[in-house]
């Protein structure tokens, strides 16, 4: 996911409301009769960034669009504000957000004066962006401050495209092995196994009993829904009466491109979709196994 190189397949750019506040970043009262110099060091941008890919994990929701745990990347942050009866706007680019730039400079505070540095901070899904902008104000000690006020704050973020149940075509990728679920013929049934081809597509459905995984690449007409056999192998069945077709996904809706999930069978309740080196195929549903799978939206 990278906004610098254009929007990658499976992702989209959306605009969301975010929280921005003005804070007193630095305050100094010079009660002497001569000017005082002070060195100030600030960090502009995101602090404590640990992601080399710039992909962040939301620690709290962003409106109704992003839920806790969702992955996203910040493209821009824009804040409009008022100060001293004037309205202004400040923008921070992707580079400025992620570079976490340290700035040090010296200020001079006149005698019997108070220096206040206002800093504009923004919170985007738990990512704390400091010193988007700053305003320096010098007033007499005890004088009235002109406190800046945020009018509107929004961010453009990159997120995985939403997976619409019953509609969006996806690939299902094993998170550790980096191979895709494919469909082969075994015992005159379509069966799931891992492979490197990206041509195999699936659609997720949900009803009151759980999720179903439908293949769009069956070689036996009508045999489309993944279920666990009693021995654990994954085959594709017809109709909707088989309770072994139902799965639980460990993530709340909406699902998005790039989500990492597990599939637990609703019939064999302690068994999960996993890799197993079987005699002919290697996608199984086994007891106490909860392998992780990556959902990838297929480009329309």
From Swiss-Prot:
<keyword id="KW-0204">Cytolysis</keyword>
<keyword id="KW-0929">Antimicrobial</keyword>
<keyword id="KW-0813">Transport</keyword>
<keyword id="KW-0354">Hemolysis</keyword>
<feature type="binding site">
    <location>
        <position position="284"/>
    </location>
    <ligand>
        <name>an N-(acyl)-sphingosylphosphocholine</name>
    </ligand>
</feature>
<feature type="region of interest" description="N-terminal cap domain">
    <location>
        <begin position="12"/>
        <end position="35"/>
    </location>
</feature>
<dbReference type="GO" id="GO:0006811">
    <property type="term" value="P:monoatomic ion transport"/>
</dbReference>
<feature type="site" description="Important for activity">
    <location>
        <position position="211"/>
    </location>
</feature>
<feature type="site" description="Crucial for binding sphingomyelin and inducing hemolysis">
    <location>
        <position position="293"/>
    </location>
</feature>
<feature type="binding site">
    <location>
        <position position="229"/>
    </location>
    <ligand>
        <name>an N-(acyl)-sphingosylphosphocholine</name>
    </ligand>
</feature>
<dbReference type="GO" id="GO:0090729">
    <property type="term" value="F:toxin activity"/>
</dbReference>
<protein>
    <recommendedName>
        <fullName>Lysenin-related protein 2</fullName>
    </recommendedName>
</protein>
<keyword id="KW-0964">Secreted</keyword>
<dbReference type="GO" id="GO:0005576">
    <property type="term" value="C:extracellular region"/>
</dbReference>
<keyword id="KW-1052">Target cell membrane</keyword>
<comment type="function">
    <text>Pore-forming toxin that specifically binds sphingomyelin in the plasma membrane of various cells. Has hemolytic activity. It also has antibacterial activities against B.megaterium.</text>
</comment>
<feature type="binding site">
    <location>
        <position position="235"/>
    </location>
    <ligand>
        <name>an N-(acyl)-sphingosylphosphocholine</name>
    </ligand>
</feature>
<feature type="site" description="Crucial for binding sphingomyelin and inducing hemolysis">
    <location>
        <position position="22"/>
    </location>
</feature>
<keyword id="KW-0406">Ion transport</keyword>
<keyword id="KW-0800">Toxin</keyword>
<feature type="region of interest" description="C-terminal receptor-binding domain">
    <location>
        <begin position="159"/>
        <end position="299"/>
    </location>
</feature>
<comment type="similarity">
    <text>Belongs to the lysenin family.</text>
</comment>
<feature type="disulfide bond">
    <location>
        <begin position="274"/>
        <end position="285"/>
    </location>
</feature>
<dbReference type="GO" id="GO:0044218">
    <property type="term" value="C:other organism cell membrane"/>
</dbReference>
<feature type="site" description="Crucial for binding sphingomyelin and important for inducing hemolysis">
    <location>
        <position position="189"/>
    </location>
</feature>
<keyword id="KW-0472">Membrane</keyword>
<comment type="subunit">
    <text>Binds to sphingomyelin as a monomer by using its C-terminal domain. Forms a nonamer when sphingomyelin/LRP-2 ratio is lower than ca 500. Oligomerization, but not binding, is influenced by the fluidity of sphingomyelin.</text>
</comment>
<dbReference type="GO" id="GO:0016020">
    <property type="term" value="C:membrane"/>
</dbReference>
<keyword id="KW-1053">Target membrane</keyword>
<keyword id="KW-0812">Transmembrane</keyword>
<feature type="binding site">
    <location>
        <position position="187"/>
    </location>
    <ligand>
        <name>an N-(acyl)-sphingosylphosphocholine</name>
    </ligand>
</feature>
<keyword id="KW-1015">Disulfide bond</keyword>
<feature type="site" description="Crucial for binding sphingomyelin and inducing hemolysis">
    <location>
        <position position="247"/>
    </location>
</feature>
<dbReference type="GO" id="GO:0042742">
    <property type="term" value="P:defense response to bacterium"/>
</dbReference>
<dbReference type="GO" id="GO:0031640">
    <property type="term" value="P:killing of cells of another organism"/>
</dbReference>
<feature type="region of interest" description="Beta-hairpin domain">
    <location>
        <begin position="36"/>
        <end position="109"/>
    </location>
</feature>
<feature type="region of interest" description="N-terminal cap domain">
    <location>
        <begin position="110"/>
        <end position="158"/>
    </location>
</feature>
<keyword id="KW-0044">Antibiotic</keyword>
């Amino acid at each position: 996911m990278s906004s610098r190189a254009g929007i990658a397949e499976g992702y989209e750019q959306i605009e969301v409301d975010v929280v921005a506040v003005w804070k007193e970043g630095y305050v100094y009262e010079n009660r002497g009769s001569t000017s005082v110099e002070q060195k100030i060091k600030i960090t502009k941008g995101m602090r404590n960034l640990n992601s080399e890919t710039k992909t962040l994990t939301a620690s709290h929701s962003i409106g109704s669009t992003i839920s806790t745990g969702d992955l996203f990347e910040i493209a821009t942050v824009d804040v409009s504000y008022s100060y001293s009866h004037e309205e202004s706007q400040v923008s921070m680019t992707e580079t400025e957000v992620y570079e976490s730039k340290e700035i040090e400079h010296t200020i001079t505070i006149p005698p019997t004066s108070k220096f206040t540095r206002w800093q504009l901070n923004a919170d985007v899904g738990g990512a704390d962006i400091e010193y988007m902008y700053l305003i320096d104000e010098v007033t007499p000690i005890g004088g009235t401050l002109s406190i800046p006020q945020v009018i509107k704050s929004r961010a453009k973020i990159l997120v995985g495209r939403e997976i619409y149940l019953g509609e969006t075509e996806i690939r299902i990728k094993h998170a550790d092995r980096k191979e895709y679920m494919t469909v082969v013929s075994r015992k005159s049934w379509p069966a799931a196994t891992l492979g490197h081809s990206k041509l195999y597509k699936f659609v997720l459905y949900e009803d009151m009993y759980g999720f179903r995984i439908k293949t769009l690449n069956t070689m036996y007409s009508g045999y489309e829904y993944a279920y666990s056999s009693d021995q654990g192998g994954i085959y594709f069945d017809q109709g909707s009466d088989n309770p072994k077709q139902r799965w639980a996904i460990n993530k709340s809706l909406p699902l998005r491109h790039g989500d990492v999930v597990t599939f637990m069978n609703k019939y064999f309740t302690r068994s999960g979709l996993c890799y197993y080196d079987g005699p002919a195929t290697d996608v199984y549903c086994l007891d106490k196994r909860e392998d992780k799978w990556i959902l990838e939206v297929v480009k329309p």
